[in-house]
């Protein structure tokens, strides 16, 4: 067991001071948290600096904080921002470590068993270990996570109890230390020295923690006593300094001691006998044979190695949980008084609520056909009410909070003023009769001023027809549809910003990474057709696409005024009035955001010296494509090493596109 440091303070480092209505939002949020309020909503308009406000709140309340985002890309962006704000504190990243994941499944209609197939990202696995170890060692921790944080992880008590604690002067034999390391799933390898491994050279044991990627520790013995412990560069062996205490955390989150393992194996065997009897009674002899063979193999592996592939499916027995009891998750690694912040809560809470059912239906099929014991059903994500039971205090952050958040609390704190003085755009409604020619005139007016236009339609056919028509009219236009790959999508956004074309047509322009300051006009076709993209939240989010330009304007083409349209227009007008009053009072003139146009191709500069080469990938022969993949893979690892996961994901998608050509 390790002692957690509880007196560290968060230290926020920023060249900015809170401005606009940030000071009031920060003060209200902090007062409510310190006053014991369980849930509150930060309703911040696009571009008002919500992440900065969140950072100020974390620094002032000084609580370990879990920030949950609805996808890896957004989690990566937030992680980078929090890292900049808190360079002297533990800012951690916890997302699914699979680059590729095909879950275990069975399709009875075709009698097809799909074995679990996955590719684990070593860098992200390291960061997950770094997150859990930081939570057990200190209190000044921010973990930025995706919804994978509600999936089963392993007992924090077993994880903490298994820590191997070393210090100079400790009486322990070298062989005892080696056994202890093997017990916590470290692997001896005297040649290939990397994370989760150790090597032995006479009286010296070198250990490479699972949460590190560059530094290892050299433990030097004098007889049966530790003489000294030194931190070294894993690659060169260069000594970086001596340490007076070293805590080695397990190399896997699913760890249990020998006594607990024997109890778990006995329970697995008992459950196996029970399930075999059930299958035989039902005449399911094939299922019984399949289950017996698979489970007995896993039991043998657990007995001999303490681990087996798919060990998480036995986590109920290994953790000593009862049937139906929720699994341990990342949330259990936090102390009781931690703070949760849900970013883009209108999206994230929907994911959290929906995870359980999808996982359950897939696993029930595996259990019914003899691929897994029924206890595998308890290796699962948390149900909504189980997640809620972990909540001590929570802040939902969104420009458009969902129904769920509004049901949880009446405390809504608004953040409407942008530091740049930018206003929410003006919104007008025009009839659909003659809408295309009307829109053409508006586009041409924008082109003359070197500004850009977004057009959002409801159907693929309309988007394609509109794009073709505008091209005939001499407009430089592109259509962004769902089939476009990630890298190509980012290139399209870049080209729009550079003025390679002036108009972007799409169906769903709400996805992340689509904010373009040069866009001064957003046209919403079929605005009166109620649905996901034309409800109040969808319309407000779409209107927000024009909120980064001082000339921002939105035109809704519709023949009737729906309630969603009216509410979205009223809310935008309300925010705009508040922003205008603030600007007038403080003499602020709105300024279009000056955002650097990042050279998206530069991520692959060494492999692809110029843009022309990326376009002509099809002309490369098989060997040239193979060489390019090798170079790109090196750059992907480099980007991941620099914690630029968005960049790494873009390069990965390019690699997949090149591989698909063979």
From Swiss-Prot:
Keywords associated with the record: ATP-binding, Cytoplasm, DNA damage, DNA excision, DNA repair, Excision nuclease, Helicase, Hydrolase, Nucleotide-binding, SOS response
Residue ranges that the Swiss-Prot or TrEMBL entry lists as coiled coil: none
Location of this chain's protein in the cell: Cytoplasm
SUPFAM superfamilies assigned: C-terminal UvrC-binding domain of UvrB (SSF46600), P-loop containing nucleoside triphosphate hydrolases (SSF52540)
Domain Helicase C-terminal: 435-601
PROSITE patterns assigned to the protein according to its UniProt record, in alphabetical order: HELICASE_ATP_BIND_1, HELICASE_CTER, UVR
Domain UVR per the UniProt entry, residue ranges: 626-661
GO biological process: nucleotide-excision repair; SOS response
InterPro entries linked to this entry: Helicase/UvrB_N (IPR006935), Helicase_ATP-bd (IPR014001), Helicase_C-like (IPR001650), P-loop_NTPase (IPR027417), UVR_dom (IPR001943), UVR_dom_sf (IPR036876), UvrB (IPR004807), UvrB_inter (IPR041471)
GO cellular component labels: cytoplasm; excinuclease repair complex
Gene Ontology MF terms in the entry: ATP binding; ATP hydrolysis activity; DNA binding; excinuclease ABC activity; helicase activity
Residues the record lists as binding ATP: 44-51
Keyword Nucleotidyltransferase among UniProt keywords: no
Motif range (Beta-hairpin): 97-120
Disulfide bonds: none
Main location: cytoplasm
Every Helicase ATP-binding domain range: 31-188
Annotated family: Belongs to the UvrB family.
Binding partners and assembly: Forms a heterotetramer with UvrA during the search for lesions. Interacts with UvrC in an incision complex.
Domain notes: The beta-hairpin motif is involved in DNA binding.
Reported function: The UvrABC repair system catalyzes the recognition and processing of DNA lesions. A damage recognition complex composed of 2 UvrA and 2 UvrB subunits scans DNA for abnormalities. Upon binding of the UvrA(2)B(2) complex to a putative damaged site, the DNA wraps around one UvrB monomer. DNA wrap is dependent on ATP binding by UvrB and probably causes local melting of the DNA helix, facilitating insertion of UvrB beta-hairpin between the DNA strands. Then UvrB probes one DNA strand for the presence of a lesion.
The protein's name in its UniProt record: UvrABC system protein B
Organism: Streptococcus gordonii (strain Challis / ATCC 35105 / BCRC 15272 / CH1 / DL1 / V288)
Gene that produces this protein: uvrB
